[in-house]
Amino acid sequence: MPLDEFEFSVLKTIQTHHLIFPGHKVLVALSGGMDSMSLLNILLKLRQKLNCEIFAAHLNHMIRENAIRDEQFVYSYCKKAGVKIFVERFDVPKFCADRKIGIEEGARAARYTFLNRIAHENGIDLIALAHNLNDLVETILYRIVRGTGLSGIVCMKLKDENKIRPLLYFKREQIEAYIKRNNIPYVQDETNFNLKYSRNYIRHRIVPALKLLNSDLENAFSQVHFSGMMLENHVKRLIKKYSERIFRCGKRIIFDSKDMDEFEIIELVKYCAGQMNVDLNYRQIQLVVSKLNENSWSIDLSEDIAIKKGFDFFSIEKKCKFMNILKVGKPGVYKFNDWTFELSSEVKSNEYVFIHDQGGVCIRKRKAGEKIAGVKMKDMMIDSKIPAFLRDEMPVVCTIDRIIWVPYVYVDRCFKERKEDSLVLNLLQNPYSCILELRKDERRKMV
């Protein structure tokens, strides 16, 4: 059977954007509504051309009285069409009540969890979602009203990991015409007209009002969406460009912002925060922007995550307690917070000191106002380009009466030369070597 104009356009979208490849298994998220029923029928008609296999999945959210009707409808339809369908029930109202979240948010989370699990368990490559251009408009408006950044504008994509949206750039009226023209049955979700749901209010109140200003609202928003995607792609290239300047150091992610502009710094801050599972809000971003020209500072992002700046370095880190002091005695390995030392008879690293008398040697944190040879340790760390957020974690190696070594900052000359019975305290592992080595040529090694 030849393709009609709409089906051909969907095929071209799939081929142009490489949504489905030969041999792929595709799972259609089938609610039974107009959009998902049209998507299922189009993919069934295209499956031979695409050389793919089509499945369907339906989750009964147990929210509406007619949910059983919808479940039975999609099951019966797929059985007649020869399509394998996966059907499950999930008590979304209880799920939302237990987690104190809204019905819309909870239903979406439950649905995606279900779809991903079905795909994984059955070796299915792609999940096909029936979002259309009107859905895109409504979602962007919803995100803007809630307060969003770039990610909110590019909230839906034609392809997003294992999810595809072949109908994303088609208007709802095109889908309605296709359904009517082909006599495709569907069920109507009566809650789509309930204005207590935010998306319905946007659909039935906000969008019609905006169309009085621009009758071609959908295409206007698709242009905004396209621009957002171009900017997002630029940010991805930016992250790749500076990937060698981003370091994961224990419970920190640190990046070197030297010679970066404000836009680049903020995008890297957002990226690194995201790697720590923190989504920066507008207020936090504005606060970071306001402090960019300051040399050192700290901002709490959550109860256990903070962002700190020292010189050109930014650190997004988990808050944690650190060891204050560690005694060094017999030869062996010593761990001081994230630093690893070894006391042995041999030089085993580039960073080391000779220990002439093992008695009374310890590794500790610096003390407030502490001086070495009359110079404040803080000033020495500043001269050595140690970022402020690392200074309290720098190990200070002491004997009973003097500081003999602060790695990357100071070494007492008397402990740089071996004596007859000396042992060697080697720095084996330094979690911040990637940062400290960057400015090594600028450091003052001895006093």
From Swiss-Prot:
SUPFAM superfamilies hit by this protein: Adenine nucleotide alpha hydrolases-like, PheT/TilS domain
GO molecular function: ATP binding; tRNA(Ile)-lysidine synthase activity
Catalytic activity: cytidine(34) in tRNA(Ile2) + L-lysine + ATP = lysidine(34) in tRNA(Ile2) + AMP + diphosphate + H(+)
Regions that span the bilayer: none
GO cellular component: cytoplasm
A biological process term (GO) from this entry: tRNA modification
Pfam short name (any one): ATP_bind_3
Positions bound to ATP: 31-36
Subcellular location: Cytoplasm
Record CDD domains: TilS_N (cd01992)
Enzyme Commission code(s) on record: 6.3.4.19
Record SMART domains: TilS_C
Keywords from the UniProt entry: ATP-binding, Cytoplasm, Ligase, Nucleotide-binding, tRNA processing
Family: Belongs to the tRNA(Ile)-lysidine synthase family.
PANTHER family associated with the record: TRNA(ILE)-LYSIDINE SYNTHASE-RELATED (PTHR43033:SF1)
Known function: Ligates lysine onto the cytidine present at position 34 of the AUA codon-specific tRNA(Ile) that contains the anticodon CAU, in an ATP-dependent manner. Cytidine is converted to lysidine, thus changing the amino acid specificity of the tRNA from methionine to isoleucine.
Designated name of the protein: tRNA(Ile)-lysidine synthase
Source organism: Pseudothermotoga lettingae (strain ATCC BAA-301 / DSM 14385 / NBRC 107922 / TMO)
